[in-house]
Amino acid sequence: MSTDAAHSLADAYGLSGAGSDPVEVEPGLWVQQVDTQRELERSWSEVSGYLRAVLDAAGVDHLTAEELTVVPGLEEVLALLELRAHVRQQHRSGGGPWDVVVVDCAPTAETLRLLALPEALRWYLDRVGGPERRLLKALRPVVGRATGLPVPGDEVISAVERLQADLLEVRRLLVRPESSVRLVLTPERVVLAEARRSLTTLSLLGYRVDGVVANRVFPAGAGAWADGWQAAQAEVLAEVHDSFAPLPVWTSSYAAAEPVGPDAVASVAQDAYASRGTEDPFAVPEGPGPVRVRRLGATGPGERRGAELRVSLPFVATGDVDLARHGESLVVTVGAYRRVLTLPASLARWPVSGATVDDGVLRVRFREAAAAAAAEDDVPEQGEEQPW
């Protein structure tokens, strides 16, 4: 399934007039071009209506207000709700029609930020719910008269809460051990730098990356014109292997013609995955996820036990990370990206005793608080790691 508004997936398979429902192009292969506008209207209509009212009151013309009420990249994230629908269908039917679902979703800067939206919304809504929401309701007439701007009603806040619940469910789906992200790049230095940043950000957000596909690689013997490109690509490909080790790196050669149609697309896939002798490109990735917790024993007489939260942050040094403790949450900031980690109940009671970054892994150490020394908790046994 593709979330690309330009319908590039439908074009690649030579489908004309493909609708928003899955279309079978080969036995066992279905293609879907997601109707992002439909999801946008369903999930964002109340909120966009309120934002239009605010902008209208501020004197913004109608057409400009219509554009400003759509968050850049939101359509792509909302399209992932269609993925959730497919998984629900799978569970309801006790197996369902799909063995695997592949989502063509470009990891742009906006999309990476919006993948953090569910947790950010939860942090915000936790602070406008309960007494704060009742206070807002009581003060709504006063605030409206004082500012001259519309104040969000219950239906707007409820719509945001529904969207947050939907996106949290999508997030839980995407961070399962069976789910993973596969990066696609071309062997160019600028593209490689962006792919490295994408790996760091995806790991920070808790998404597992299972490998890298290097696309449009000039094959040997392509001719004198391509010799310069081939030499330059060979240098970058060596950096790709070094940068992403131990992740597998597949290479796909530059095709003689644009691959359009099921046969041409299948040929590209066979070329890429044969480059490493991969038998099952859809195999569930092994090994720990990007975020996990490990129990630590007492370090000496009179010391309390502890735990270590580990977050994979490739290409990051200690000075690149900012940490802040906020109640039961740990706020991790790397460059322009921030993640609010809601700590397990056990760790939420324990103070942070230190943090370092070693070999691309952020290690945040907690020491048991005196009041919790005898309490039951959900920290794993000593030396054992468990996923976040």
What are these regions (language model features)?
Residues M1-T3, L83, A195, T200, ...:
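Primarily hydrophobic membrane-targeting regions of prokaryotic envelope proteins
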Residues S2-V175, P187, H241, T251:
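Flexible phosphate-sensing "switch/lid" loops adjacent to ATP/NTP-binding sites
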Residues L168-T318, G327, A336-P351, R367-W388:
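C-terminal lobe/tail of nucleotide-utilizing enzymes
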Residues A317-V321, V331, G354:
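A basic, amphipathic helix-loop patch mediating RNA/tRNA/ribosome contacts
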Residues V332-V334, V364:
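Short hydrophobic/aromatic-rich beta-strand segments that constitute the beta-sheet cores
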Residues D358-A369:
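C-terminal beta-strand-rich structural cap/linker in extracellular carbohydrate-active enzymes
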